[in-house]
């Protein structure tokens, strides 16, 4: 009897040892990511579509954050959670705040601290996914006030993804292509955003779909 109990316990131990834990994913960003965990947000949508036994999704977004803010709070808000994957979605405030409050991030500082965030995560054996900032206005004729800067900062992120061989969710490109097909009136908002920047229902679903494609690649 006792031998049977020991044998059962041993088999149970072996079986649990081979049960893989869900991949823990932290979404690291600004107010768009902060809102992503709310009902109907893109992270909430991902939680409903990705298998819970394969993915654990955690939001780590704070409104107004720029790349330097992410760098400063990495330890408490990301590393302490011991993620397997970190999805970095930042850059819109680094550009937007240049015009709105004069507190944006200059290009050299943006790239330097973005690279520092990547290196810190990789030093902790965390897989990194990069995202380009999506929109500051949805007009399709390149007359949104900060299209030039947003394209430049998106190019910086694409370059970092190439140099570090990282997966990229190119939301800037995806939003531009979607708006070209679905914004015939050349509106500055209301297609994928509520206010030119933050996501509406369709925008959250669109981002969730883009994220899912990258997160499930190879699964």
Question: Model-derived features: where do they sit?
Answer:
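A short beta-strand-loop structural module common to alpha/beta enzyme folds
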Residues: 53-66
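Alpha-helical cap/lid subdomain in secreted, periplasmic
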Residues: 20, 44-53, 69-219
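Bacterial Sec-dependent signal peptides at the C-terminal "C-region" and cleavage site
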Residues: 1-24
């Amino acid at each position: 009897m006792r031998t049977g109990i020991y044998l059962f316990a041993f088999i149970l131990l072996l079986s649990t040892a081979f049960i893989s834990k869900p991949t823990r994913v932290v979404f690291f960003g600004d107010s768009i990511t902060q809102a992503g965990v709310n009902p109907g947000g893109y992270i909430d949508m991902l939680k409903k579509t990705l298998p819970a036994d394969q993915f654990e999704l955690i939001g780590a977004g704070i409104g107004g954050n720029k790349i330097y803010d992410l760098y400063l709070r990495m330890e408490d808000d990301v590393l302490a959670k011991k993620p397997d994957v970190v999805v970095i979605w930042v850059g819109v405030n680094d550009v937007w705040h240049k015009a709105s409050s004069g507190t944006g991030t200059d290009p050299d500082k943006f790239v330097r601290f973005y690279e520092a965030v990547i290196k810190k995560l990789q030093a902790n054996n965390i897989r990194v996914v990069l995202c380009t900032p999506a929109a500051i206005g949805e007009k399709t004729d390149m007359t949104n006030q900060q299209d030039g800067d947003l394209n430049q900062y998106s190019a910086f992120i694409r370059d970092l993804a190439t140099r570090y061989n990282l997966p990229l969710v190119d939301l800037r490109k995806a939003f531009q292509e979607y708006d070209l097909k679905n914004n015939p009136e050349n509106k500055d908002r209301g297609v994928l955003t509520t206010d030119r920047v933050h996501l509406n229902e369709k925008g959250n679903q669109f981002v969730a779909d883009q994220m899912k494609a990258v997160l499930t690649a190879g699964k």
